[in-house]
Amino acid sequence: MGKRLWLWAPLALFAFFAGLAGYMLTQDKDEFVESEMIGQPLPDFALPAAFDGLPGASKADFAGSPKLLNIWASWCLPCIAEAPQLEALKAQGVEIIGIAIRDRPADVANFLGRYGNPYSRIGSDRISEVQLAIGSSGVPETFVIDAKGVIRYQHIGDIRESDVPKLLAELEKAQ
């Protein structure tokens, strides 16, 4: 009798793991990691220029008025998709400071030449140190920073046309 029971044990284990896998596949998952830095001041940073066309970026650049901080990269396909919306925000008077992640100067310049340049400054974060310090987990991500340098809002993923009013409203709230 004991030997027969052991013959069924592999089948029972397989059924258990198959059931567990099936259950996990039916559960909702959160694909976005929200920053724990919302409501906190930007960490101190001073990044060199991402290319020769614009100055670098630092925490001091966020004083005075609300601004957008856009985390992006030339190798990021969703960053191409959001380029027209960033241009639209710039056309409405929004100052956008960029941080290019793990990028080369020539690639940054080429990207901006092809898709437009909505940025007043772009810092080069070659090892993603600042990106991680502000709680960004990917590219693109955009943060609303208030006039005192406090992170007020995080937009995860590329900015779509339908997201522009929300970002403008968050900038207004950050006054």
Predicted regions mapped to residue ranges:
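N-terminal targeting signals for export/organelle localization
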Residues: 1-48, 175
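Short gly/ser/thr-rich secondary-structure transition/capping motifs
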Residues: 27-28, 48-55, 122-125
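Hydrophobic beta-strand anchors of alpha/beta hydrolase catalytic cores
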Residues: 68-69, 96
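Structural microenvironment flanking redox-active thiols in thiol-disulfide oxidoreductases
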Residues: 80-116, 126-132
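A short beta-strand-turn-helix
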Residues: 45-67
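Thiol/disulfide oxidoreductase modules built on the thioredoxin-like
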Residues: 113-118, 125-175
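Aromatic-flanked redox-active Cys/Sec active sites in thiol-based oxidoreductases
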Residues: 70-75
